[in-house]
Amino acid sequence: MDRDSSMQAKNLDAQCNPDLKMASANSETLASATHELKIMDVEGGALVDPDHIEEVETSMVIVVDDDDGDVAMVVEEDKHPMRDDPCIEDIMDDEHAPLVAELQSALNNPDDKQASEDPLLEDQEREPDAMSTKTEPSSDAESSHSYHDPMGLLERIEIHDPGDSQDDDDEDDESSNGGGVDGGMRRKMPRAQRWLLWMKRWPWILHEDSDGTLAFCLYCNISINVNNRSRHIQQHNVSLSHQERECNYLAFKKSEEETRGAISDNEIKHEFGTKSYVAAMKQKRISETEAFNNFNWLRWLRWHPWLERSMPTGTIGTCRICSVRMNVEFVYLRKRHETTKGHMEALRNLDSDKRSRKRKRSKSNSVTNSGGDEAEREKESEPEVGPEDAQDTPVVMMNGDVDSGDDPGKWCALIPDTNPQQCRCTLCNCTMAITSFLRHCKTRAHCHMLSTPAEKGSSDIRGIWAVFADMHPWLIADPEDPSIGYCSVCRKRFMYGNSEIKRKNHEKSEKHTLALASAKAGIEVGSADGRGGDNMDEEEAAASDQAQSSQTDDSEDNDDDNWSEIQKLGKGFAHKSSSEPRKATVRAGVRFYPWLCYSKDRKTQICKFCRVRFHNEAAKARHELSARHVKLVKQFKMRQAKLHQGTNTQTKHNAQDDEESQEQDEEYGEEEEDAEEDSQSNFDLGTVQARKTARADNKLFVKPIPATMKGKVMVWKGRFPWLSYKKNEQRGNYAWCKLCEVSLYLPSSKWASKHQRTSRHIRLRIDRKRNGGNPLKTSNKNSGEISTVVATASALASAEARQKAAMAELQAKYDWLDPDANDENHCHCRVCDSRLPIKVFYLRQHDASRKHVENKERQRANAAAAANAPSVSPTSTVDAERQESGMDKESENDMSVRSDGSTAEPLAKRSRRSMEVRRIIRALRDSMGKRQEERSQMDMARDMICSSFDIVTRLRTLERESVAHNESMAQAPPSVTVSPIKPPEPRHVMDLFFDSISPTMKSLPPDLAAEGKSKIMQLVCSLELRAMQRNATTPTPATVSASSKWPSSTTVTPVKTPPAPISAPLASVDADLHSSVVTTPHEYNNGQNNNNDKETVPKEPVTGASSAQVTINGSAKDLPENIRRILTSNQTQVTNRLETDSVRCVPLDKLTTQSRTNVNGRLSQGGTSEAPSTPQADLSNGNTLAMIRQIRVNNNNSSKITVTNTPQMQQPQQAQASITSSTPIMRGGPSSNGCQITTFRTMVNHNRRP
């Protein structure tokens, strides 16, 4: 305790003595203390007198704890750490509260006040005047690392100002280091004490225990989270917003003290009724917010005249010049707005407006007096305005300096009663907004007028616009830019001076009309007063009433700017022209040509008369002087002059001019280019080019545009004979071109002229003339329409004739070429059976191709072989049949998936079928001499459209089953001898017929081709049956004996059939062809009763019979076992195919009905088609017993055959002969009750090709 009290006494002594603000902890003198460094602080450091330093050699440990840990920092006697060092303050802890020597000095309480009182009260250093108003960073940021100097580069302590050190923490740090006696003492500082130190160091901090980690900023009136770290306080202290608010608040407090006097801290606490100084200061700061804001606004409004307060609270203000709202709390925001370009421009305009208004008043007063004293009054008025101008902000031109005596405002004349305010430059005679006058003063045109002032009545006032002087007297050159038009009546720029429509619209506008009327009234008043004649233009003095409208440039402004006129006419121009040293360089304006327009792509300029393109200005100037251009312009003017001769000759001239312009377009090859304005006379729209006559006369000959397209066609068909319309056209403004046969959008006649100049229309018109379709150029409307129709028909006919001639020429060169019936741009190669485009390149390429050559050689070889060989051997025929049957075979999946109505067939099969149809048609063309017979055959082939895919599929299925049974029964010896097949007949015309019809069938769609083949097969089958019925003489059945016997329980019931009518005699096709069928007697009713079960027949040993063999598809095959084993010697019979009693035909139309459905490739049981219940019979030979054949296939795995008894007179020889010459082919169809009925037929073609 004694040591602590001694340390406190030493600290008190150091506190009383200002020279001992900072003491060294070492006993060495200043000269020998090489480790002491200069503290880089704003307040500076204090030099400690060595006589007052206690020599303490022991080191002292100061533990400054923070919330993060309890690590103690040991301060050696050779080091002087600071409390604000981050590495030290982070280890401070408030759990321990030992006595700290520098606490009393930090609280600055030498009078030992009571503990209950606030330690911050009555602190001399907390006076408002003594508060820090610094704007630079505080000392903590610089002193935090000032002691860490291992290189010894910092300066030593030499000079110290006692008044500069205000860092209480540094002072306490040094005093604590120097006041320690016991080196082992540990010093810790609680959190509350640390907040007191921070509040002492930064006067703007207010903190209570209830605030936690938050600190209240007195200057900013906000709470900040410092998180018990001094670096966060330091960061807020150096912010710009805090520093500016600090300046404002200290100024506010100073003004409060001057008006009310200083208030002590106790008075503040008593005022708010609290014992806490911090709480009282917070409440006081909140209560004076409005007063502080008003104080700031007074200062801001005094500093910035352009600023005005827009709201009673807050810091949002408005710029009265720019009318912009902004936040003006901080100085950089206000300075930034002051330096903006818009604010500076508005400020200059405002200053110039003020000066011009004052000068205008002084000038107008001087004009009312006598004319002799005008100069003296001007001199007297100048000194009065001078002081005001000297006080105003000088106007600085952006493009250079301006002389002090040069005031651009003298050329500005305000136009009254305008909002926004408009002004007029009296030098350039142009109107603009008041805010644009300064920019106008910097333009080249204005500078050029200043350097070389032009007289009012100069001949170049119109410039390049002189060509429109007769039509538009008000159009002159713009004073600023002569290349731009200018309306002298409305006093405004006219940007579209080269457009006739724009000039016309402006001349008819209400504004222009009113300005012209007011100008005429002003001229009349001026002439009555004797003031209007002095300003007349020499060029415009001899003009008519239209020319007088351009004289209002000066007379309109005689009332308000006579001072500018006197100055300009008197001494202003001469003085400026003589005293102005600066001359601006003026660039020559771009010359405009009235005949210049743009192309369709809007990229290239062309001459609308000559259709010549331009890429530079020199070419335009040369073209204007060319003889060709001059000639065409004269022709155009002549056509325009003819427009006023009357309505009788108007249509005729327009038609001639139209033809002339079209011929010129064709001559120069620029038909596709479109001019900006039509070269034709679009009199119905009023878009007439520049002409010399008055436009009022032209309005007498303008035809009104009808509202309907029919009316437009009636009006325009004299000029456009190809024009027509559709009665059923629903769209508006759509016409019809009879020559191009297209619909056109024609809102006006200009669009018709555009279409008339298109390349397609011109080409068709040339073709029409070339082929003899010359329309008569008469005014008669009916004759024009008739001639147009005839020309169109002849053009179409000529096109077809040309197509035929070109095809004939190609066929003469390429014998293999055939025209395509569907597309005139393609052809067909009959050798390769391919489709080619009619192009010379492709035709040559195909003719020289290897594939074409090989196909051609193969065709020649086949033709030679067919001509030399009279017959074909049976073996080759059988091989060909076998090869064809192998090619026709398809997989089981394809056949099962295939449906009756499906059209998807294999590509090879479809191509083969179409080739067969083409061969048939080609044979018909070659054999038939007459065209009618040829067309009838083609129609017959096309009408036979039905698919036979189902029939062929089922027949092949039965054939496969037969082959399987024959292979299983191969050990059985054959019992039926098969005679050799007859040699086929030589090739005849029917083969050629089928060869020619195949290409035609190929060209058909797949579904139509399949249906056609089916119908062809159906027709051939019916013809074959009729031929067999006609050629049948007497039945000669052959009985095949078998060793097997029927059981006693089995009975055979003959089936009687009604006689069938005999067909008419027909030409015999294959009279010598014979076929045989295998028939077995059985009950016919079993097939109709849907008995699908196989008959149970007791098996008996075969005693000596051999298996019967038949020819199926050209090959000898054994009879299936299930057929042979149920036949006896007197029941197994092979009948002649020609015998009609053994033939039963099922109509094929019943097999191809649309009501059938496909179930796994077979007919469903619910089909509606029925087969006849009784077979056909022919009683011509006297045979009353009919033979019935019926084969029912059940699930493709079994067959059931029934036979009937035939007379015993049938000869075996005929049966054997007929069996060997036939190929049984089975065809199936549904019975009446839905079961499957399979029939046999023969289709023998000895001349079939592979």
Curated annotation (Swiss-Prot):
Superkingdom, natural source: Eukaryota
Domain BESS positions: 987-1026
Amino acid composition bias (Acidic residues), ranges on this chain: 164-175, 553-563, 657-679
Chief place of localization: nucleus
Localization (cell): Nucleus
Keywords of this entry: DNA-binding, Metal-binding, Nucleus, Phosphoprotein, Repeat, Zinc, Zinc-finger
Zinc-finger keyword on record: yes
Biased composition regions of type Low complexity, renumbered to the chain: 543-552, 1032-1055, 1206-1224
Pfam families: BESS
One GO MF term attached to the UniProt entry: DNA binding
GO biological process assignments: dosage compensation by hyperactivation of X chromosome; positive regulation of heterochromatin formation; positive regulation of pericentric heterochromatin formation
Biased composition (Polar residues): 132-141, 1079-1091, 1104-1114
Keyword DNA-binding: yes
Residue numbers spanned by region Disordered: 107-148, 160-186, 343-398, 525-564, 642-684, 851-915, 1032-1060, 1079-1116, 1154-1180, 1205-1236
Example of a GO cellular component annotation carried by this entry: pericentric heterochromatin
Residues in C2H2-type zinc fingers: 217-236, 319-343, 425-446, 487-512, 605-629, 737-761, 829-852
Sequence ranges of Basic and acidic residues compositional bias: 343-354, 851-860, 879-897
Residues annotated with Phosphoserine modification: 165, 175-176, 871, 873, 975
PANTHER family, sorted: DNAJ HOMOLOG SUBFAMILY C MEMBER 21 (PTHR44029:SF1)
Function: Dose-limiting factor in position-effect variegation, the inactivation in some cells of a gene translocated next to heterochromatin. It could play a role in chromosome condensation.
Assembly notes: Interacts with Su(var)39 through the BESS domain.
Name by which UniProt lists this protein: Protein suppressor of variegation 3-7
Naturally occurring in which organism (per UniProt): Drosophila melanogaster
Protein's gene: Su(var)3-7
